[in-house]
Amino acid sequence: MRILLVLRGNYYAGQEEFIKNNKLQNYTLDLNALRLLSGSVKNIVSEYKILNVKNDEDLSKILLKLLEMRMQKGEFSIINAYNETLKIYKDLAKQYRYKIYVIVFDSSLKQCQEKNLLEAKKNGYIIPYALLEKTQDLLKKIQKNTQF
């Protein structure tokens, strides 16, 4: 099944619930999971830790390599990477004859901030508010120009 599903939206906009509720964990490549695996965690002054985005360029390359490995075998794949651009996925889809479907999770910044705090209380990791704001702004700009 040559289908690539790209989940777009800010952090905690509903992607994780969608994946869990539909039992899609085994098909999902997630940038935050790679951040945790790479040890990209920073302690901050508060009781929480943050996922360090400093290595995101390298982790994005790893994510794309993992995706390409799946695509070479024709496997159904889901990307949860908070992407502002879809071009790289379009190129891979064309190369491996995949159909792309994009699900946009359009939660407000306030909703994402509230969910961020709730999740931080559960798991000890918080996404910096500045990153939530930056991601929200980028997604707004890009969504206006995105066509499939």
Give a label for each model feature.
Residues 2-8, 13, 17, 25-26, ...:
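Conserved GTP-binding G-domain of TRAFAC-class P-loop NTPases and closely related GTPase folds
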Residues 21-23, 90-97:
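Short, surface-exposed basic-aromatic patches at helix termini and helix-loop junctions that form
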Residues 5, 27-29, 101-103:
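Hydrophobic/aromatic beta-strand patches that form the interior of the parallel beta-sheet core
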Residues 78-89:
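Acidic, metal-coordinating catalytic cores used for nucleic-acid/nucleotide bond scission
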Residues 74, 96-101, 144-148:
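Short glycine-/polar-rich loops that comprise or flank the Walker A/P-loop
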Residues 3-5, 75-79, 100:
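Generic beta-sheet signal
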Residues 96-115:
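Conserved phosphate-donor/acceptor-positioning beta-strand/loop module used by diverse small-molecule
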Residues 15-75, 111-113:
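Conserved substrate/cofactor phosphate-moiety recognition/catalytic segment
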